[in-house]
Amino acid sequence: MICRSFPVCSTQMERKKAGMKCVIFAGLPAAPELHSWWADADYVIAADAGYENACRVGVEPDLLLGDYDSAPRPEAGAKTVFLPAEKDDTDTYYAARKALELGATDVVIVGGLGGARLDHTLANLQTLVFLAKNGVCATLADTDNEVTALLPGTHRIQRSE
């Protein structure tokens, strides 16, 4: 039996070996116990309210991106991309596209599961599929869940203890 691990990376060590790791902070608060997900990030993007969430856990993003409909608008700067309020995709999806454009091979989205906006959770799940189809090992992570999109094929998933 041939098992593929692409795009699933079984350990964080494997993920780091894969190439550039980008962490995206989305709109829901990030728990400090998720520190291991962003500690070794090569690049950090904060999508809209994700900026406040990153700051709460002591992370200074490399790029701020969003329409700022759910957070105070930051001062314009070289590391800020302002998106139009009227658009077809979420701020987190735009952040994922930016990560892909920057050459990320591993993307972790924190603050993208649950909350009052089911539409955003579903959009974030679709974002995982988009990233997987583009060859990126991508995960949505919170304190209780790790979600990864699997493309057709055979996969070996290691049980977490």
Report each predicted region and the residues it spans.
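Charged/polar low-complexity intrinsically disordered segments
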Residues: Q12-K17, V136
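N-terminal beta-strand-loop-alpha-helix module at the start
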Residues: R15-P74
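Short beta-strand segments
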Residues: I24-A26, D48, V110-G112, A141-D142
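Short, well-ordered, mixed-charge alpha-helical segments that flank or form enzyme active sites
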Residues: P32, R117-H120, V147-L151
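Acidic/Gly/His-enriched mid-domain segments of enzyme catalytic cores or analogous surface patches
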Residues: A49-K133
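Short, acidic/small-residue loops that bind anionic groups at enzyme active sites
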Residues: F130-E146
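Long, charged alpha-helical interface segments
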Residues: T143-N145, L150-E161
